[in-house]
A protein has these predicted regions:
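Conserved glycine-rich Rossmann-like NAD(P)H-binding loop of the short-chain dehydrogenase/reductase
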Residues: 69-74, 233-248
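Substrate-binding pocket helix/loop in short-chain dehydrogenase/reductase
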Residues: 72-74, 94, 297-298, 305-306, ...
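Active-site helix of classical SDR
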Residues: 133-137, 321, 357, 365
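Short, small/polar-rich loop/turn modules that mediate ligand/substrate recognition or access, typified
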Residues: 149-154, 182-185, 373, 378, ...
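A conserved structural motif in NAD(P)-dependent oxidoreductases
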Residues: 160-168, 407-418, 429
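Short C-terminal tail/terminal secondary-structure segment
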Residues: 184-208, 434-448
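Residue(s) in the substrate-gating loop at a strand-loop-helix junction
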Residues: 341
Length: 448
């Protein structure tokens, strides 16, 4: 959707008008339009730093070189990517390494730059001081994301277990790449608890995989189906019969297979399972995107509105999973992604029913992750913030403008931004990440 402030800020005259009015001046965010490149960081100037005794630096250098990044050796050149190995921060005195690395770069960093900090897992340390030092880095990274957000730069944190350093490539490629446009101020956990695939290569890794995306006729679901199709995934697009025209149009555009189905129907899980088995045998990727809102304050909410949201957003998801997992229709090394919401993290006025279901999904993926790890299955949730869709376009003007600006990059996200994160979580390179909930919100100012 069109954002007038971005257009105005893109010209000298318009930028002056925006400044005069005291309005935020959002920058044009860098986005990818195609599939993964063989060298996702090709041509980007990268600067790497480390804390004393950091255990990830050698692997990070290797990943950067293999991805085509250019080590920054010339003064006066703006860094496109900053990567800091902070795994050696085990006491307050070690924090000086963060200051010494980042402080000189703060005025030089390029627009749409990428910052990734790698830290030790606090839970791995038996020393409370070391655990606190590792956890403190999250406060630093979130604050830095707010400082750099107005330039379109993203800052993210990857906690990595000592035995999972070899699984960092996927996180580096995504969080240092163009695809992480609207993901900033986030922390992920890279561990070895999920059985790793033979290859962690990102480029071409999803070719010929079979994916099912619910609620894919429009919006985020449609963008997700499109993005997966760009990686040569065979996509099954599911939506309700009322969305038949839009669903079939989407499927024609991307070569997907349409399936009209109300996922809350009593026989829906069985129908889905039979359809997958008859057409493909088994499934590699499952994206639970379907969901509805029925907003009212609890005092004014009807029983039907409560039940509809719980049935579609949560009960149907669990019922489908139960059948697909019980009948082994989901392959080993499958990827499961669930669309949660900022409302599930922070709550929202008039959304007690919706926030309830989206928070439940966060708990669901965290509880399922260890149960599926032995099969190499990763399960994660994605929590979008203000995303420019037909629904947000219908919001009152002031509410829409406030929603757009209440984040570090001062603008709304695009459905493609959510689809990029979903697609990354479906790759072999994301095998170290399971049980996490990652926001796609431009670091919205509400929630944790």
């Amino acid at each position: 959707m069109s954002d007038l402030l971005i257009k105005l800020s893109g010209s000298r005259f318009g930028a002056g008008v925006v400044k005069l009015l005291g309005m935020p001046a959002p920058v044009e965010l860098a986005r990818s339009a195609g599939p993964y490149a063989e060298q996702p960081l090709a041509g980007k100037n990268i600067l790497l730093g480390r804390s004393q005794n950091g255990y990830a630096i050698d692997r990070l250098w290797q990943i950067a070189r293999d991805a085509g990044a250019l080590p920054l050796e010339t003064t006066g050149v703006k860094p496109d990517i900053l990567v800091m190995d902070a795994t050696g921060c085990a006491s307050p005195s070690d924090y000086r390494a963060l200051y010494d690395f980042f402080h000189p770069q703060m005025r030089a960093i390029a627009r749409n730059a990428r910052v990734l900090i790698v830290a030790a897992l606090p839970a791995e340390s038996r020393d409370p001081v070391a655990a606190a030092a590792a956890r403190g880095i999250e406060g630093f990274s979130r604050s830095l994301a707010k400082e750099l957000g107005p330039r379109g730069a993203t800052v993210n944190l990857a906690y990595v277990a000592k035995d999972a350093v070899d699984r960092l490539a996927g996180a580096v490629h995504f969080f240092c790449g163009v695809q992480t446009t609207y993901v900033t101020g986030q922390a992920v956990h890279v561990t070895s608890r999920v059985a790793a695939p033979v290859s962690l290569v990102q480029h071409g890794a999803l070719k010929a995989k079979v994916a099912l995306v619910t609620g894919s006729a429009r919006g985020i679901g449609r963008a997700t189906a499109q993005r997966l199709a760009q990686e040569a995934v065979q996509v099954i697009c599911v939506d309700v019969p009322a969305a038949s025209e839009a669903l079939h149009r989407t499927c024609r555009e991307i070569g997907a297979i349409p399936l009209l189905l109300d996922i809350t129907g009593p026989g829906a899980p069985r129908q889905l399972a039979d359809f997958i088995k008859e057409r493909f045998g088994r499934l590699n990727i499952l994206v639970h995107n379907a969901g509805i809102t029925r907003d009212k304050t609890l005092a004014n909410m009807q029983e039907q509105s409560w039940d509809q949201v719980v049935d579609i957003n949560l009960s149907a998801v669990m019922a489908i999973d139960q059948v697909l997992l019980a009948e082994n229709i989901l392959r080993d090394e499958a990827r499961l992604v669930y669309l949660s919401s900022i409302s599930g993290i922070s709550g929202n006025f008039g959304q007690t029913n919706y926030a309830l279901t989206k928070a439940a999904l966060i708990g669901y993926v965290a509880a399922q992750a260890p149960l599926l790890a032995a099969r190499g299955i990763c399960i994660n949730a994605v929590a979008p913030g203000f995303i420019e869709t037909a629904m947000t376009q219908e919001m009152p003007f002031m509410a829409r403008e406030i929603g757009r600006r209440l984040n570090s990059v001062k603008q709304g996200g695009q459905p493609r931004d959510v689809a990029e994160l979903v697609t990354f979580l479906c790759t072999p390179g994301a095998c170290g990440i399971s049980g996490d909930t990652i926001r796609v919100c431009g670091q919205g100012l509400v929630g944790a």
